[in-house]
């Protein structure tokens, strides 16, 4: 399918202008509304400080859960400690109007876009007359740089780039690195397929067997047989995919859940942080069919897909067609693996004389299909069809090799069917499924079934599920052919079994084929009765089960009867969709205390603690892996006569269970502690903290590349998921034939550039070309890491200087800011376009504060991503980082802050941007609706521990983890610093870091004196990084105005990844990078925010219980905060848990995987923004394209 057709119908239609409202319940009102003039006035009412409360960040519903606040001991009351006393002085108060970079842009853009306050209510986003008139306000101010660059510009003002629909289709060239079969492997294959020693192997080829999924394997051709062998992907306990989906029901139109695909279970949760309480769980072993819903008119894919089981049909809505297809592919692969979970390989053995027809047909470029029709057996004479796909063009070689060997057999006197029997029509793989005979010679049992969903055609139509089975040869289900005179015709064997011991001795598994059963008999139809066994429920005694993990005495009074034990275990597995590996140890009747007590039954198995509510109308389930449990302990009951057990979970709130008898409470505590001891003893690293909120596909670039390849071949009409062979002898990996050219565009400070350098280094390792586009002052920093650099104008230091040198708002400041900002933004727009147009990037990743990328990618028609460190996406979970309220105000307010910021930000730059689009880019004017900013793939380089993905985030919004740039390997600490650290340790003193960056304060000396006094009172050693001063750019900022005592060392800038592990606590301004570095080191963190997103991260650090947010900084408040940070054990332990979680994240790898995942979607979003047709003279002749423009994008499977 051409990429031009992969556009959502809703995206291709024009809609109304963006809207905004000042009423939380109605966040939508046109920008041209009379109320719009109140926006700037409303901004001044939003305080830049947010007070803390014990409630979680709200989404307007109790379903949205965030990381819980730390216990009261860790979050001491502000008044008691005094570090947030409202009456105290704030010596760190900015002398001037300090803002963050994006905040500066917002404020100045309002000034520039609204030159006259009386015209605010009549400004229009796309009115060229007003933008032109405002341009003439000071037309020549700040334009000298742009003018000189225009004169030297050799390229045309309008870009001549090929349209997406004019570019050549993607070329897929698959190949697998071949290794010669060793004697050991040949021997195992002979044993596997029961071959004679005198039967040599002639050839082997990589191939794909087509069923409901495309299974990668190998074809082997011997002198007598055609063999196919493939390892089924193993089923590790890892998340395969996760994200937000809407579930549609008859009663409730649509409900949004966080969905996780793991093993054979597809589970739904209320949020990404509540992963122990599933709302709905679907067992893929019971799923009959998975399909994408099609449009009734044109048959194109929609955002909806369905899962069919024997009892129900589940309907899901994804955020895009790409997301729906990704979910369907992932679910089909897991369904195939789950329904063959007791087997880890597929084998196919076809005697060469049985082959009737070999037909090859090209499909996509080099890809080729090979249909092989063979006689099933001498008993039934049914004809089976097998479809193979070759991605590297080797299919013709397979056909040629088979033809040559068949000719040799014919000459030697063997009767073959290849030429004797003409091809006849049969039910082939391109029609309905034909059940194939499957035989296992080494197993004497018959009537064995194995469920394998089969599909025949590479299309969206799914066939019915057929059963491949071991059956008697006397069975005559198939059409009989005329008997042949050759009585030596062998049978075709299609074997699904455990091949670990046959092929690879390093993989251990047991061959096990389950008995034939009716599908309705396989699922035990239990109907739980809440009124059954009332005696047991009221007695509330423990129930023990025989097991090999916790042995019980034979005379145990709580031991269940052997006759009831099997049915009890089966019911347990049925309720929680477990496999046979789970076995019960004990059960209890209890109350689960969360918001309200819920009565139910708790189940303890060998590695899981589960809970199921028993009250009518209640549907609470809990599945808690024991590896996530830290410990458990007894507590007094909340009610008289009840006894409480507290289960402590890593990085999660404690769970409280109330038991009516002390015996039951003590018994479950004893069993849980013993199981935890066994887990810790079996793991060399102790307990593993699982993170089920992040999918394996997000961490594994190979899985992401496979998804990108699936997206590309789906666009060609070949809609089938791929399963990679996990053969230990043939390593398979995917990488592009073409090296992509990435442009990383950002503006701001060093903290804005550094994450892009880390991402760029990761992309270079993937074999891509990377250019970082930013300010000239970072050239040496970027190039020192081996990354190409391009300079753009628009250095925000000039604008910041203007802001901090004017002590108050006045007419002079507004006029000066307006004039300088207009020249500043013009230079940024022009130079950014020149760089991107000259470099011909394939993909652009931009910080949204740079403002220009979304327009440049529309002109160049390339995929566009955004990446940032703070909340920039519309959500009800978090407020915008620059409009953080003084207290939590709920989901409606949070959403409103994003709408408000977007409109104000766009209002200030729309006039210049639209003029630049028309005159330079050759595009039409635009507005917020046409830009579709909320549809752009977004990467947040923040840990999901600090910034959990919201339930209302779209599928293309990814919280990847921090992009750390480790410099500690090259850093050599000065001797003075090492001696200082050693002295603190030798004296047993706590060591803290204090640094606030280059900020401007009212009285630098007074602030330094307060800091010294606080350190002395807290009795700690301090490594100081002084950067504050009374004027921006002051060269004396690094020098101290007062003499420092012996326990304070002013050392200047030191790499955080080296320094922070050396200290016990950190005090800083709360920037995203610094916050990530301190939490990565497991440090209790004290944050004194000054502007922008620093307030947001101060609140988050306090919310998760690993630090303190200071409203005001003076000697007393800082001293109190230092004492808490260095002595509070609960805060220290919680910071250690956060450290473990962050250490398991790989933000760069996850980001690269997300880029691969969303690349085709990003391309479609860019294309959908192209609304204005180009002029005829701007059309590009495909024959005149540069080599870079005509290069095919290919992927190689190695």
UniProtKB/Swiss-Prot annotation:
Result when mutating residue 849 to A: Displays a reduced affinity for cholesterol
EC number of the protein: 2.4.1.-, 2.4.1.173
Signal peptide, first to last residue: none
PTM-bearing positions, type Phosphoserine: 76, 693
Compositionally biased intervals (Basic and acidic residues): 142-162
Xref: SUPFAM superfamilies: PH domain-like, UDP-Glycosyltransferase/glycogen phosphorylase
Gene Ontology biological process terms in this record: ascospore-type prospore membrane formation; carbohydrate metabolic process; lipid glycosylation; sterol biosynthetic process; sterol metabolic process
UniProt-reported outcome of changing residue 851 to A: Displays a reduced affinity for cho-lesterol
Disulfide feature: none
Impact after mutating residue 851 to Y: Reduces the activities toward acceptor substrates and completely abolishes the activity with protopanaxadiol
Gene3D superfamilies listed in its UniProt record: Glycogen Phosphorylase B (3.40.50.2000), Pleckstrin-homology domain (PH domain)/Phosphotyrosine-binding domain (PTB) (2.30.29.30)
Domain GRAM: 187-236, 570-636
Comp. bias (Low complexity): 52-67
Biotechnology note: Repurposing the glycosyltransferase activity via mutagenesis enables the production of ginsenoside Rh2, a potential anticancer drug isolated from medicinal plant ginseng, using protopanaxadiol (PPD) as sugar acceptor.
Summary of the function given for this chain in its UniProt record: Sterol glycosyltransferase responsible for the glycosylation of ergosterol to form ergosterol-glucoside. Also shows activity in vitro on other sterols such as cholesterol, beta-sitosterol, stigmasterol and tomatidine. In contrasts to what is observed in Pichia pastoris and Aspergillus oryzae, is not involved in cytoplasm to vacuole transport (Cvt), pexophagy or nonselective autophagy in Saccharomyces cerevisiae.
Family: Belongs to the glycosyltransferase 28 family.
Name of the protein in question: Sterol 3-beta-glucosyltransferase
Organism of origin: Saccharomyces cerevisiae (strain ATCC 204508 / S288c) (Baker's yeast)
């Amino acid at each position: 399918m051409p990429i031009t057709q992969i556009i959502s119908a809703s995206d291709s239609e024009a809609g109304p202008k963006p809207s905004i409202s000042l009423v939380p319940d109605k966040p939508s009102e046109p920008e041209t509304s009379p109320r719009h003039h109140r926006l700037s006035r409303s901004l001044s009412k939003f305080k830049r400080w947010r007070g803390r409360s014990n409630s979680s960040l709200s989404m307007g519903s109790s379903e949205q859960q965030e990381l819980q606040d730390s216990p009261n001991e860790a979050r001491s009351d502000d008044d008691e400690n005094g570090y947030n006393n409202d009456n105290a002085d704030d010596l760190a108060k900015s002398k001037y109007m300090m803002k963050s970079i994006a905040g500066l842009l917002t404020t100045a853009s309002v000034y520039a876009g609204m030159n006259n306050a009386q015209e605010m209510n009549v400004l229009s986003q796309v009115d060229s007359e007003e933008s032109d008139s405002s341009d003439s306000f000071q037309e020549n101010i700040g334009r000298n740089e742009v003018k000189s660059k225009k004169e030297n510009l050799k390229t045309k003002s309008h870009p001549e780039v090929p349209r997406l629909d004019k570019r050549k289709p993607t070329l897929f060239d698959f190949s697998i690195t071949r290794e010669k079969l060793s004697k050991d492997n040949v021997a195992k294959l002979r044993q596997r397929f029961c071959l004679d020693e005198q039967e040599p192997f002639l050839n082997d080829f990589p191939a794909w067997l087509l069923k409901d999924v495309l299974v990668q394997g190998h074809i082997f051709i011997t002198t007598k047989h055609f063999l196919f062998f493939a390892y089924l992907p193993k089923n590790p306990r890892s998340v395969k995919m996760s994200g937000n989906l809407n579930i549609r029901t008859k009663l409730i139109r649509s409900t949004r859940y966080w969905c996780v695909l793991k093993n054979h279970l597809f589970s739904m949760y209320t949020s990404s942080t509540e992963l122990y309480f599933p709302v709905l769980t679907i067992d893929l072993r019971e799923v009959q069919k998975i399909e994408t819903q099609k449009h009734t008119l044109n048959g194109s894919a929609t955002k909806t897909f369905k899962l069919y089981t024997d009892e129900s049909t589940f309907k899901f809505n994804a955020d895009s067609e790409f997301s729906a297809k990704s979910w369907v592919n992932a679910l089909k692969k897991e369904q195939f693996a789950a329904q063959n979970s007791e087997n880890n390989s597929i084998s196919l053995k076809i005697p060469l004389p049985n082959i009737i027809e070999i037909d090859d047909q090209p499909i996509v470029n080099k890809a080729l299909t090979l249909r092989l029709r063979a006689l099933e057996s001498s008993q039934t004479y049914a004809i089976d069809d097998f479809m193979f796909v070759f991605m590297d063009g080797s299919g013709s070689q397979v056909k040629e090799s088979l033809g040559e060997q068949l000719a040799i057999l014919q000459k030697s006197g063997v009767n073959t069917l290849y030429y004797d029997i003409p091809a006849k029509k049969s039910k082939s793989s391109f029609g309905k499924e034909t059940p194939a005979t499957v035989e296992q010679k080494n197993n004497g049992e018959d009537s064995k079934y194995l469920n394998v969903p089969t599909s025949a055609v590479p299309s969206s139509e799914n066939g019915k599920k057929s059963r491949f089975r071991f059956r008697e040869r006397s069975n005559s289900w198939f059409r009989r052919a005329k008997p042949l005179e050759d009585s030596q015709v062998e049978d075709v064997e299609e074997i699904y079994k455990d091949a670990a011991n046959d092929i690879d001795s390093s993989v251990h598994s047991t061959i096990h084929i389950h008995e034939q059963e009716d599908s309705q008999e396989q699922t035990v139809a239990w109907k739980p009765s809440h009124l059954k066994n009332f005696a047991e429920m009221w007695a509330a005694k423990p129930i023990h089960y025989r097991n090999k993990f916790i042995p019980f005495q034979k005379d145990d009074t709580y031991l269940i009867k052997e006759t009831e034990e099997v049915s009890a275990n089966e019911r347990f597995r049925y309720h929680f969709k477990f496999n046979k590996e789970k076995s019960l140890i004990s059960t209890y009747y209890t109350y689960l205390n969360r918001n309200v007590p819920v009565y139910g039954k708790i189940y303890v198995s060998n590695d899981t603690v589960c809970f199921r509510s028993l009250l009518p109308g209640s549907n609470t389930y809990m599945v808690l892996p024991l590896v996530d449990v830290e410990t458990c302990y007894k507590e007094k009951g909340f009610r008289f006569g009840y006894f409480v057990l507290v289960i402590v979970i890593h990085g999660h709130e404690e769970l409280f269970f109330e038991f009516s008898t002390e015996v039951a409470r003590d018994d479950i505590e004893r069993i849980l502690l013993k199981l935890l001891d066994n887990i810790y003893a079996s793991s060399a690293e102790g307990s593993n903290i699982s993170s089920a909120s992040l999918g394996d596909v997000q961490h594994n670039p190979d899985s992401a590349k496979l998804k990108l390849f699936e997206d590309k071949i789906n666009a060609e009409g070949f809609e089938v998921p791929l399963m990679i062979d996990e053969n230990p002898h043939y390593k398979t990996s995917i990488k592009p034939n073409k090296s992509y050219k990435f442009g990383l565009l950002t503006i701001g400070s060093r903290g804005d550039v550094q994450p892009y350098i880390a991402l760029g280094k990761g992309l270079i390792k993937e074999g891509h070309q990377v250019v970082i586009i930013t300010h000239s002052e970072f050239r040496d920093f970027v190039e020192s890491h081996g990354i190409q650099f391009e300079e753009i104008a628009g250095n925000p230091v000039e604008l910041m200087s203007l802001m901090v040198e004017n002590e108050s708002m006045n007419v002079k400041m507004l006029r000066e800011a307006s004039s300088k900002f207009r020249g500043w933004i013009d230079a940024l727009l022009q130079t950014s376009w020149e760089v991107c147009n000259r470099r011909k990037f394939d993909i652009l990743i931009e910080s949204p504060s740079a403002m220009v990328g979304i327009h440049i990618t529309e002109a160049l028609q390339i995929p566009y991503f955004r990446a940032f460190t703070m909340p920039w996406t519309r959500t009800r979970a978090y407020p915008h980082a620059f409009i953080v309220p003084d207290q939590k105000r709920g989901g409606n307010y949070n959403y409103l802050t994003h709408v408000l910021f977007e409109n104000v930000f766009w209002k200030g730059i729309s006039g210049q941007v639209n003029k630049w689009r028309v005159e330079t880019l050759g595009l039409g004017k635009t507005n917020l609706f046409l830009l579709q900013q909320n549809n752009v793939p977004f990467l947040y380089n923040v840990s999901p521990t600090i910034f959990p993905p919201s339930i209302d985030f779209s599928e293309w919004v990814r919280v990847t983890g921090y992009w750390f740039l480790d410099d500690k390997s090259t850093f050599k600490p000065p001797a003075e610093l090492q001696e200082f650290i050693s002295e603190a340790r030798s004296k047993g003193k706590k060591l803290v870091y204090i640094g606030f960056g280059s900020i401007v304060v009212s009285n630098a000396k007074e602030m330094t004196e307060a800091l010294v006094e606080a350190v002395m009172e807290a009795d700690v050693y301090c490594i100081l990084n002084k950067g504050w001063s009374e004027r921006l750019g002051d060269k004396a900022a690094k020098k101290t105005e007062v003499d420092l005592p012996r326990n304070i060392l002013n050392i200047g800038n030191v790499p955080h990844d080296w320094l922070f592990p050396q200290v016990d606590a950190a005090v800083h301004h709360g920037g995203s990078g610094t916050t990530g570095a301190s939490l990565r080191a497991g440090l209790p963190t004290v944050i004194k925010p000054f502007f922008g997103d620093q307030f947001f991260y101060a609140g988050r650090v306090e919310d998760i219980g690993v630090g303190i947010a200071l409203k005001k900084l003076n000697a007393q408040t800082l001293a109190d905060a230092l004492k808490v940070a260095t002595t509070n054990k609960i805060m220290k332990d919680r910071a250690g848990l956060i450290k473990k979680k962050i250490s398991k994240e790989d933000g760069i790898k996850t980001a690269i995987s997300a880029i691969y995942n969303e690349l085709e979607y990003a391309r479609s979003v860019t294309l959908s923004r192209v609304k204005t047709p180009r002029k005829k003279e701007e059309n590009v002749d495909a024959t005149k394209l540069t080599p870079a423009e005509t290069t095919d994008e290919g992927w190689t499977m190695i």
